Amino acid sequence: MRRGALALLSLIAAAATAQETASGSDAEALAKQLANPVASLISVPFQNNWDFGYGRDDDGWRYTLNVQPVIPFSIGKNWNLISRTILPILYQDDVLPGTDESGLGDTVQSLFLSPKEPWPFGLVWGVGPVALLPTGTREVLSAEKWGAGPTLVALKQAGPWTAGVLANHIWSFAGDGDRDDVSTTFLQPFLNYTTKKATGFVLNTESTYDWQG
């Protein structure tokens, strides 16, 4: 089963930096850092997703608020380790016919090893492991499986534009034996435009392919 989602509103973020930021070019530079998933910057983005055509009969819909704290750790002169957590807060209706549910979903924890300086042609990248943690508060909101796999992100920033893609694949290795195994590929291309007044406009799409479906 392939599921598509459109993030209609993305990245209203609170950021903490070691330096004070001023208006103008400094604020614009900070906004561009926020557009980079592996920037050396502590941030807490909030992402709102609406999914339609969901569930057994394709009549359901789901709203998800993803809380996505990003915390960088310096590893020597040349590398950063970026912790990126996605904690979903969910409400869904008619995913199971005639029902509605709300609560926390499963947490996805990623770690990206990323060079501190861009590579040739301005390429920024990060690679590492991703883990699925069964933190869902209700059975219908959780896979009830532990999972792991690889993840990567690659992007380029040119002028006011940031374009890139984030991807991962997760296989389950433990959890409720009565639930289906997890084998999913996630793909998220994204495009960001930052104005001179440090306002960011973000468009991204999310696709998940369930190899067990």
What are these regions (language model features)?
Residues 19-213:
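Transmembrane beta-barrel domains of Gram-negative outer membranes and organellar outer membranes
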Residues 1-26:
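Cleavable N-terminal export/targeting peptides
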